[in-house]
């Protein structure tokens, strides 16, 4: 689950303007909108929502949200109309505020996946910062472009600031034990009697490798395939190809499973034949056990002779399973 606000389970994304003339310095700015209700109509691909506030009657700030159909990426643009006789200066900020509560989807069948903040720098393309790391110390770094987000098993929320500016990224905890991953942009300056704007983006949705790669460099690294990445990556590619034809993710997963089953049909057949053979000779094996009792050497030799006579490999049911196991671990 993404973005909620309840007792002990705050997961909130916020953005605004701080600094010299920032309107969010002493608290959240109050905006007004033209309409009370906005809806993306049928046939409409883009929805624009403008929130407007005035500062001392000579500066107007419009916070423009742009939503696109079938997209989890939101454009947020700050448009400043400076009708004063002085330069207007501020910094754009974006933050994710989250309490330390577990994500049920972060516990998979083969271990706990990463739950925490993620970011990138020029020197390190993918940095993971969990709650314990923030408890130890706050961290801050500057980089050109970049992004900062919060990662859980299947989903990601991330702020992507202006990619041409130098931005500062910080992870910290406040006195109320709330955890923050945030950025502050470089100077946003609007000259006297002029208009200026700055755009940022916010993504909140599933971890789609190809979508994330197009949004910002290294954002696709938030998909942690683990030590079986060499299997997971092609499986995901195949899944996206099937989904592009079918158009239904649930059906695509079923078809992918059938494809994998078909690829391993011969191995599965060998496994089932071996298991059937073992069941068939069970009475004879019991007779051997009764005959040799505590004579382990005799029991072992007679058992191996039986396997050879019946042409059965006792490991025939296990080896195909071991070969298939890594692949099905990646399908979980």
Stretch-by-stretch model annotation:
Residues 1-221:
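Soluble non-transmembrane domains of integral membrane proteins
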Residues 78, 90-111, 151, 179, ...:
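Helix-loop-helix
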